[in-house]
């Protein structure tokens, strides 16, 4: 699991509340239920209105995916593909039928099975890349929900502040309460801006990044599957797949003992 999002969100909120304390403020003065209820509920409701029910019901799953991203290291994926290529070159493609069942990555496993079943290379490439494109579109929709929430939240907060100021004007006859009421009115704007920039927008950006990583790995797997099907030299397969990685992810090949 990559903890960057959890650490970043905690750090952002800690910095804000820490600054409030250092300035002599009371953290509980901004932990007001009505503004929180308005901002969170209004933001989620606005996002629901702008999409379809499937997008909204997937929020929890997308949130979990953003926070607990799991991926096979690229060098491990390449090692798996090279190992399969060596066996296929030595024993034939059909010999991979049992080995394919032990492959950890579902996409790679399905692609290998299709290759073993004799699917035409061009058709196999089209099917696998179509699956990558479909995943990319689905991930884009999931990230958009959080990006939209980040756009709505500040405006919802302003609505809360206006409502609070209306309440202030209703109590002008009680000057002793005005300071408290005005401060409370602006808490909604604070939570709107804070949740947008410290929660919703970062999660949306995280989902986009996770999608990029996962789709890149799927494309890497496609190239490996097609190379195995073509009977390519395992060393060439490894070199080709490593050439598709960013320089900082490339690890030197292990030399034979």
Each language-model region and where it sits:
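Large intracellular
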Residues: 3-7, 15-142, 214-257
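Helix-termination/interfacial motifs at the ends of transmembrane alpha-helices
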Residues: 7-27, 131-210
């Amino acid at each position: 699991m990559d903890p960057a999002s959890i650490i970043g969100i905690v750090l952002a909120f800690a910095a804000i509340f820490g600054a409030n304390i250092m300035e002599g403020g009371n953290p509980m003065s901004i932990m007001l239920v009505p503004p929180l209820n308005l901002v969170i509920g209004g933001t989620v409701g606005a996002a629901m209105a702008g999409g379809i029910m499937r997008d909204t019901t997937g929020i929890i799953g997308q949130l979990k995916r953003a926070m607990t991203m799991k991926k096979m290291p690229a060098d491990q994926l390449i090692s798996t593909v090279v190992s399969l290529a060596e066996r296929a070159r030595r024993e034939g493609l059909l010999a991979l039928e049992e080995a394919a069942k032990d492959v950890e990555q579902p996409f790679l496993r399905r692609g290998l099975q299709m290759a073993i079943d004799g699917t035409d290379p061009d058709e196999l490439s089209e099917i696998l890349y179509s699956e990558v494109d479909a995943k990319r579109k689905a991930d884009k929709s999931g990230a958009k929900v959080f990006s939209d929430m980040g756009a709505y939240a500040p405006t919802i907060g302003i609505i809360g502040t206006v409502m609070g100021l209306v309440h202030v004007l209703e109590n002008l006859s009680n000057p002793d309460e005005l300071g408290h009421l005005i401060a409370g009115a602006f808490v909604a704007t604070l939570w709107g801006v804070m949740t947008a920039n410290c929660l919703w927008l970062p999660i949306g950006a995280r989902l986009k990044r996770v999608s990029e990583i996962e789709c890149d790995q799927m494309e890497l797997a496609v190239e490996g599957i097609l190379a195995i099907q073509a009977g390519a030299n395992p060393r060439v397969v490894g070199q080709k797949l490593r050439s598709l990685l960013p320089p900082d992810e490339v690890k030197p090949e292990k030399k034979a003992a």
